Amino acid sequence: MSFPFSIPQDMKVIVGLAPQHGALLTSDYVSLKTAHKAWVCVVANQGNGAQMVISLEQSPLVSGVGHIPIVSPVPIWLCEDADTSDALVEQTAAISLTLTVGLTKKLVIFEVDPALLTAGYDVLSCVTAASHADNQTC
């Protein structure tokens, strides 16, 4: 018997960032006011060897006004080459992840407990930086 769980029925799934090229990208700001847990999934298709830094920011408003980096480390998983493997390897808990320079498609998952966000900051976004315009992220 399968476990009675369905992602579309038991979770709120959103696309916070449409696939696009760019060196500095910020996703939508998503309210976690009623969430028990959030997973931020990032696909990075590196077309250039520049290292990409992926981080999470918190804000008191869905407009993003007053945003600051998260301060509590969160669990992170990484698939270094999603074209050849589906293995997600747990990384050291952190507030950001710097990807390697390999020209591969990478999958990164951040697991966020909204209770660990700064008091009054219940909105989350994902930011990519230190990248290159040839790198595609979603």
PLM features: residue spans?
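Surface-exposed, low-hydrophobicity beta-strand/loop segments enriched in small/polar/acidic residues
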Residues: 1-138
